[in-house]
């Protein structure tokens, strides 16, 4: 798809679904859309759901007029970084207006101002994680132009949303979000998403350095991996899709993702949807914060910026982190009590009262990395022309859904098929078995062994370990 200097404008969607009087009807009611979102265990693209959103016109040029010269922070990165991920701690930052960004993106011959040090052919710029409540603090009326209520979340709008504006090559390193699931509305330009399921976590080499609350990074540059250093990555099952204007991508809980801009200008809007599992995840994150801050501060108390992500304002004291942990544990118990009161009103077959352990088991059963609940999709698949699954097969076809946002079809004209549930379960079990057998029983030590603080932290705050610690904390306090 050709794109001009400003980038691709949002496309007009085809009027395929009409009501009795000729008005356009969305393929899913809010109730049905929410039901689908809460039951899906794999990424999928919603089509024809945002044709009436005022925010569909939010090109970067339009937003530059709305913001009226307001400065925002851009992350500057190199277009080529080899096999090493370009973490945010390795980037530089520029405060500029959208007008200055668009000028830099279009005309290098007359460039001046904050971007003058950055050669457009070598650098990309990304205004990422821009929360509406901060960006539009004096223009709150624009919140209503984003209508997540159409997906079954009444009252949810721009106030709970984040804006992303980038140039060609701008990307976020591969990571998973600790909380919630994600809805992403592509407004302008195209973005390519590389996604990996939660059960592939051992193959993604997770790390918490740089540290950012609620983000687990991968040590791998997934678009140019170092397979000698990270051989297990070959076992990961990449799901790749190109998101076009007018489409909304659903990213389930704990799915790894690397996102890159394919056009000169891209604009996206997203919202993280809270889930029941987040209550326990907050305990896990509090444990992680305490361990990372304690060990890294002791190692290098004078240079926190070497390990702290720029999104984190400052490192916190042990006392403050202890308060975070206790607050998270108390909040979990408060949630259990409220849930217990609700369940007490419903008759139970065995007459027993639900306990904390039961709530933990329920949350674990809802974990997308488990096999429980995976059969829901098999009973009644919601997929069709307006809801297209992102599967490994999409990657084999060269990244389906790349062209026309009207139909959400692959290049060969066929809709992407869902990976059969039984096959998905078998692949998941096989991957976990391989992960457990990957290390030799008696590993051979190299000639020189040096265990760094980061090496230790990679073990201590591995997602599997922090989940176990959080569960032990909850169980210990509930006895």
Curated annotation (Swiss-Prot):
UniProt entry tagged with the keyword Cytoplasm: yes
Source taxon at top rank: Eukaryota
Biased composition (Basic and acidic residues): 356-369
UniProt domain JmjC: residue ranges: 124-288
Record-level Gene Ontology MF annotations: 2-oxoglutarate-dependent dioxygenase activity
Region (Disordered): 1-25, 347-412
Tissue specificity: Widely expressed. Highly expressed by Sertoli cells in testis (at protein level).
Sequence segments annotated as region (Interaction with HSPB1): 88-208
Record's keyword terms, sorted: Cytoplasm
UniProt cross-references to InterPro entries, sorted A to Z: Cupin_8, HSPB1-associated_protein_1, JmjC_dom
Cellular localization per UniProt: Cytoplasm
Main location: cytoplasm
Pfam families linked: Cupin_8
GO CC terms in record: cytoplasm
SMART domains the UniProt entry points to: JmjC
Subunit structure of this chain's protein: Interacts with CRYAB and HSPB1.
Known function: May play a role in cellular stress response.
Descriptive protein name: HSPB1-associated protein 1
Organism in which the protein naturally occurs: Rattus norvegicus
């Amino acid at each position: 798809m050709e794109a001009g200097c400003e980038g691709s404008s949002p496309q007009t969607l085809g009027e395929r679904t009409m009501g009795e009087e000729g008005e356009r009807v969305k393929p899913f009611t809010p109730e049905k859309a929410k039901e689908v979102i809460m039951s899906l265990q794999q990424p999928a693209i919603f089509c024809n759901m945002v044709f009436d959103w005022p925010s569909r016109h939010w090109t970067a040029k339009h937003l530059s007029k709305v913001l009226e010269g307001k400065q925002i922070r851009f992350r500057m990165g190199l277009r080529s970084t080899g096999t090493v991920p370009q973490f945010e701690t390795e980037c530089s930052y520029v405060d500029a207006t959208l007008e200055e960004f668009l000028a830099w993106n279009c005309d290098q011959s007359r460039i001046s101002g904050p971007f003058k040090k950055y050669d457009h052919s070598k650098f990309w710029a990304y205004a990422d994680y821009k929360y509406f409540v901060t960006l539009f603090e004096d223009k709150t009326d624009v919140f209503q132009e984003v209508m997540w209520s159409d997906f079954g979340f009444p009252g949810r709008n721009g106030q709970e949303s984040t804006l992303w504006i980038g140039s060609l090559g701008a990307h976020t390193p591969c990571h998973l979000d600790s909380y919630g699931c994600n809805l992403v509305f592509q407004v302008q330009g195209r973005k390519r998403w590389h996604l990996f399921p939660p059960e592939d976590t051992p193959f993604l080499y997770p790390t918490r350095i740089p540290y950012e609350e609620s983000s687990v990074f991968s040590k791998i540059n997934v678009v140019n991996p170092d397979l000698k250093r990270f051989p297990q990555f070959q076992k990961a099952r990449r799901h790749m899709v190109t998101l076009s204007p007018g489409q909304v991508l659903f990213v389930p809980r704990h799915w790894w993702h690397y996102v890159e801009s394919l056009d000169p200008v891209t604009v996206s809007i997203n919202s993280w949807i809270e889930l029941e599992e987040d209550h326990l995840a907050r305990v896990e994150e509090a444990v992680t914060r305490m361990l990372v801050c304690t060990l890294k501060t002791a190692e290098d108390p004078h240079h926190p910026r070497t390990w702290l992500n720029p999104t984190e304002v400052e490192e916190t004291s042990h006392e403050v982190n202890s308060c975070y942990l206790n607050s998270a544990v108390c909040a979990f118990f408060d949630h259990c009590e409220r849930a217990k009161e609700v369940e007490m009103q419903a008759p139970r077959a065995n007459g027993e009262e639900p306990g904390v352990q039961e709530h933990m088991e329920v949350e674990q059963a809802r974990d997308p990395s488990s096999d429980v609940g995976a059969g829901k999709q098999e009973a009644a698949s919601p997929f069709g022309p307006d809801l297209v699954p992102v599967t490994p097969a999409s990657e084999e076809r060269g990244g389906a859904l790349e062209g026309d946002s009207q139909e959400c079809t692959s290049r060969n004209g066929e809709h992407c098929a869902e990976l059969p549930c039984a096959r998905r379960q078998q692949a998941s079990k096989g991957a976990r078995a391989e992960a457990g057998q990957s290390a030799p029983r008696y590993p051979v030590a190299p000639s020189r062994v040096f265990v760094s603080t980061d090496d230790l932290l990679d073990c201590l705050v591995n997602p599997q370990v922090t989940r176990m610690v959080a569960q032990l904390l909850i169980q210990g306090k509930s006895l």
